[in-house]
């Protein structure tokens, strides 16, 4: 499972970007793909693991979990 670092995440709008560790292009992340209960958000520079899926607008992180 790929890992990366949260580049930024806007909790009000519910989305942000993850910088993958392999140096590939940043990946869009939507709050609905963050695993867990309650208010789902991410913090800048937080380490995460995720899968990459395709959305109509391009690559999107799915199954995002903090590590």
Curated annotation (Swiss-Prot):
<feature type="cross-link" description="Isoglutamyl lysine isopeptide (Lys-Gln) (interchain with Q-Cter in protein Pup)">
    <location>
        <position position="47"/>
    </location>
</feature>
<dbReference type="GO" id="GO:0005737">
    <property type="term" value="C:cytoplasm"/>
</dbReference>
<keyword id="KW-0010">Activator</keyword>
<dbReference type="InterPro" id="IPR050181">
    <property type="entry name" value="Cold_shock_domain"/>
</dbReference>
<dbReference type="InterPro" id="IPR012340">
    <property type="entry name" value="NA-bd_OB-fold"/>
</dbReference>
<keyword id="KW-0805">Transcription regulation</keyword>
<dbReference type="InterPro" id="IPR002059">
    <property type="entry name" value="CSP_DNA-bd"/>
</dbReference>
<dbReference type="GO" id="GO:0003677">
    <property type="term" value="F:DNA binding"/>
</dbReference>
<keyword id="KW-0804">Transcription</keyword>
<keyword id="KW-0963">Cytoplasm</keyword>
<dbReference type="Pfam" id="PF00313">
    <property type="entry name" value="CSD"/>
</dbReference>
<keyword id="KW-1017">Isopeptide bond</keyword>
<protein>
    <recommendedName>
        <fullName>Probable cold shock protein A</fullName>
    </recommendedName>
</protein>
<dbReference type="InterPro" id="IPR012156">
    <property type="entry name" value="Cold_shock_CspA"/>
</dbReference>
<feature type="domain" description="CSD">
    <location>
        <begin position="1"/>
        <end position="66"/>
    </location>
</feature>
<dbReference type="InterPro" id="IPR019844">
    <property type="entry name" value="CSD_CS"/>
</dbReference>
<dbReference type="InterPro" id="IPR011129">
    <property type="entry name" value="CSD"/>
</dbReference>
<keyword id="KW-0238">DNA-binding</keyword>
<keyword id="KW-0832">Ubl conjugation</keyword>
């Amino acid at each position: 499972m790929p890992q990366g670092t949260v580049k930024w995440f806007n909790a009000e709008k519910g989305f942000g970007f993850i910088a993958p560790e392999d140096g590939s292009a940043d990946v869009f992340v939507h709050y609905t793909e963050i695993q867990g209960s309650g208010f789902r958000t991410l913090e800048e520079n937080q380490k995460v693991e995720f899968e990459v899926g395709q959305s109509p607008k391009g690559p999107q992180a799915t199954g995002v979990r903090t590590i």
